[in-house]
């Protein structure tokens, strides 16, 4: 810790904002890694099984299959089952709202990574400029000759500040890109699931058996 503090102290006035940015970045990276690990894609066999039950009109069995299960597609199917007494357009709207809510959960806090990846190099550059200004002020002192030690410290501060900014920005940008691709891929899969579910729902007349089962569910 002492060595880290020594490096930060050499980084000049922008070192502390950069340190705070690095803490936020690390926290978001850990949070999103855990989130995506816990919320993997749903069991395809379960989804197909439930879709077949809906297709056959056995909504009670489909509802029971989903109890205690988690995942974006499970929530979509639960939404469809809860709205089977509505017309197709209302079911589609309900599915789209559920899908959008799931996407928002996946996107949560990603903006923080985007901002940090953008501002960290700028903060590093600001530290570089301030360090160089400090060095020139010393060099142009009253005697005309500055203290070499102080000049070196100013240059070191400038270089360290730039390095810290890049060290923070590069991995942050990489993780932001990685998480964004996961969100895009899963959003596409959710849209496909909505289409598949609507195909199943529209393929049935949803007659008396559906109405009876929906009443039992509610």
Tell me the role of every PLM-derived stretch.
Residues 15-28, 114-127, 168-172:
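Alpha-helical transmembrane segments of integral membrane proteins
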Residues 12, 26, 62, 77, ...:
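Residue-level signature of catalytic and energy-coupling elements of molecular machines
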């Amino acid at each position: 810790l002492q060595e880290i503090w020594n490096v930060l102290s050499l980084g000049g006035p922008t070192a502390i904002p950069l340190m705070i940015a690095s803490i936020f970045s690390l926290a978001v990276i850990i949070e999103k890694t855990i989130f995506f690990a816990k919320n993997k894609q749903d069991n395809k066999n379960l989804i197909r099984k439930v879709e077949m039950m809906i297709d056959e009109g056995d909504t009670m069995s489909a509802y029971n299959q989903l109890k205690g299960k988690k995942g974006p597609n499970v929530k979509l199917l639960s939404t469809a089952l809860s709205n089977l007494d509505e017309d197709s357009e209302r079911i589609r709207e309900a599915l789209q709202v559920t899908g959008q809510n799931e996407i928002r959960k996946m996107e949560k806090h990603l903006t923080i990574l985007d901002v940090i990846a953008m501002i960290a190099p700028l903060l590093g550059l600001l530290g570089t400029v301030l360090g160089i200004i400090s060095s020139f002020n010393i060099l142009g002192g009253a005697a005309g000759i500055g203290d070499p030690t102080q000049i070196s410290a100013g240059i070191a501060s400038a270089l360290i500040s730039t390095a810290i900014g890049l060290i923070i920005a590069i991995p942050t940008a990489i993780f932001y890109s990685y998480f964004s691709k996961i969100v895009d891929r899963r959003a596409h899969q959710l849209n496909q699931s909505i289409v598949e579910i609507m195909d199943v729902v529209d393929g049935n007349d949803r007659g008396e058996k559906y109405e009876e089962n929906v009443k039992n569910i509610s």
